[in-house]
Amino acid sequence: MPGKIAVEVAYALPKKQYLQRVTLQEGATVEEAIRASGLLELRTDIDLTENKVGIYSRPAKLSDSVHDGDRVEIYRPLIADPKELRRQRAEKSANK
């Protein structure tokens, strides 16, 4: 008989962070952890078809299993291309 595991689910905004602790059955998935956390109801801007997820900063799939003590992270979409921003900063500093 599978036991219980404790998992944290995190979602960070620039000025507010959400960290929910959930208890799940062993063998639960990333998606089950997110749904159990209640964050989808709290934050309507989270869309699991769009937002990427990870476990301790490593990319994960919604179907991946979680383990006791894991921290599932929901990532916000990038609003700008990092390469483009670096290029713009380099141009700006070169023009000074």
From Swiss-Prot:
Superkingdom, taxonomy of origin: Bacteria
InterPro entries hit by this protein: Mopterin_synth/thiamin_S_b (IPR016155), RnfH (IPR005346), RnfH_sf (IPR037021)
Pfam families in alphabetical order: Ub-RnfH
Entry's family note: Belongs to the UPF0125 (RnfH) family.
Name by which UniProt lists this protein: UPF0125 protein YfjF
Record organism: Escherichia coli O157:H7
Lineage summary: Bacteria, Pseudomonadati, Pseudomonadota, Gammaproteobacteria, Enterobacterales
Protein encoded by which gene: yfjF
